[in-house]
Amino acid sequence: MEYVYLILFSIVSLILGSFSNVVIYRLPRKILLKNHFFYDIDSNRSMCPKCGNKISWYDNVPLLSYLLLHGKCRHCDEKISLSYFIVELSFFIIAFPIYWLSTDWVDSFVLLGLYFILFNLFVIDFKSMLLPNLLTYPIFMLAFIYVQQNPALTVESSIIGGFAAFIISYVSNFIVRLFKRIDVMGGGDIKLYTAIGTLIGVEFVPYLFLLSSIIAFIHWFFARVSCRYCLYIPLGPSIIISFVIVFFSIRLM
């Protein structure tokens, strides 16, 4: 029976990895163009940017289609960006530690859903400096399910953890803005901190902020070295990396 779950998990991982390409490409553009909360990010089928032909379902099979088509459009031989293949492959590979660290099939799919959200938030924020509400808000729902599945994290600790993360991030930004007249984090960062706080509990929120601050500083330092005019960096990736370290440290304890 375990092999059935593993096969199902692999198939879902491949599908989510492929769908991540849609989310990463379309969602930031929809936000910038429409500035609206709810929208259908997959309202139109994918098409070749050169010849305009719709991409058929059999040319959208994760990983396999790219290899069989040699990274080209079936109709006009236009090169397909390697980034699509890399996103699918990296998502698929990184998904497997989640399966092996999960306690049962419900836990594995909850963690896979969380991974899908954080993976997309990481890439979108890194590329576009955006943390869409459409991806951040579902983390709260997953946190609720996760609490029911994991007795080590109580409902009280989850709620207080989210509240504490919100207060710390909001007050920190308010103080810096008061004296420096700049925002060190955006509203999306505060929401992400809050959502993640509900997943780790109040006891581990300080570690989240400590780690994310260190990682963000390292990121900022190298960004400044490579580009002296780069004043801002996306904070989301630092928050997500810190969460992964804290979260799986808790699970391995």
Swiss-Prot record:
Keyword Cytoplasm in annotation: no
Record-listed E.C. numbers: 3.4.23.43, 2.1.1.-
Keywords: Cell inner membrane, Cell membrane, Hydrolase, Membrane, Metal-binding, Methyltransferase, Multifunctional enzyme, Protease, S-adenosyl-L-methionine, Transferase, Transmembrane, Transmembrane helix, Zinc
Cofactor remark from the record: Zinc is required for the N-terminal methylation of the mature pilin, but not for signal peptide cleavage.
Pfam families: A24_N_bact (PF06750), Peptidase_A24 (PF01478)
Top-rank taxon: Bacteria
Chief place where the protein resides: membrane
GO cellular component terms listed in the entry, alphabetical order: plasma membrane
UniProt catalytic activity: Typically cleaves a -Gly-|-Phe- bond to release an N-terminal, basic peptide of 5-8 residues from type IV prepilin, and then N-methylates the new N-terminal amino group, the methyl donor being S-adenosyl-L-methionine
Cell compartment(s), UniProt: Cell inner membrane
Binding-site positions, Zn(2+): 48, 51, 73, 76
An annotated GO BP: methylation
A molecular-function term among this protein's GO annotations: aspartic-type endopeptidase activity
Topology term for the membrane: Multi-pass membrane protein
Alphabetical list of Gene3D superfamilies matching this protein: 1.20.120.1220
Cofactor(s), by name: Zn(2+)
Transmembrane segments: 4-24, 80-100, 106-126, 129-149, 159-179, 198-218, 230-250
Task performed by this protein: Plays an essential role in type IV pili and type II pseudopili formation by proteolytically removing the leader sequence from substrate proteins and subsequently monomethylating the alpha-amino group of the newly exposed N-terminal phenylalanine.
Family assignment from sequence similarity: Belongs to the peptidase A24 family.
Protein's name in the database: Prepilin leader peptidase/N-methyltransferase
Gene source species: Vibrio cholerae serotype O1 (strain ATCC 39541 / Classical Ogawa 395 / O395)
